Amino acid sequence: MRIGHGFDVHRFGGEGPLIIGGVRIAHPQGLLAHSDGDVALHAATDALLGAAALGDIGKLFPDTDPAYKGADSRALLREAYRSIRARGYRLGNLDITLIAQAPKMAPHIPQMRVFLAEDLQCPIDDVNVKATTTEKLGFTGRGEGIACAAVALLIKE
């Protein structure tokens, strides 16, 4: 078994869309990023890559490569997971923590879990998503952006 940790942060800016965990969420701004700015999937991808000792999302999908401009983070997650599967690993479980003052994530978490289970070809019970605030402290508390942490367990087959 191998454990990986991922973390990502993006600040709000532009008109959007705001995509978190593959779900489009109504919000006046999107997140500024080279790709679609999906902090949940970026943190999850980093956790998976870290567990497999394959570097990080920036190594696999460099933000200097125009091919990834505006990229769908679900596609990036699927591609990263294919590389992990090719090394003989499968997901044990994935746990994601979103950190944001707004928008409220709870209504969107069930669909995020569905997308993650689809993309990682696993039972929905192997993926968890939860959200918290920083009680209006720091950049997330001031509504300047969203942060996300993820932990993944991989099992050698």
Curated annotation (Swiss-Prot):
Alphabetical GO biological process terms: isopentenyl diphosphate biosynthetic process, methylerythritol 4-phosphate pathway; terpenoid biosynthetic process
GO MF term (any one): metal ion binding
Cofactor note: Binds 1 divalent metal cation per subunit.
Cited Pfam families: YgbB (PF02542)
Binding site for 4-CDP-2-C-methyl-D-erythritol 2-phosphate: 8-10, 34-35, 56-58, 61-65, 100-106, 132-135, 139, 142
Pathway(s) the chain acts in: Isoprenoid biosynthesis; isopentenyl diphosphate biosynthesis via DXP pathway; isopentenyl diphosphate from 1-deoxy-D-xylulose 5-phosphate: step 4/6
Reactions performed catalytically: 4-CDP-2-C-methyl-D-erythritol 2-phosphate = 2-C-methyl-D-erythritol 2,4-cyclic diphosphate + CMP
Keyword Protein biosynthesis assigned: no
PANTHER family: 2-C-METHYL-D-ERYTHRITOL 2,4-CYCLODIPHOSPHATE SYNTHASE, CHLOROPLASTIC
Protein name as annotated: 2-C-methyl-D-erythritol 2,4-cyclodiphosphate synthase
Encoding gene (name): ispF
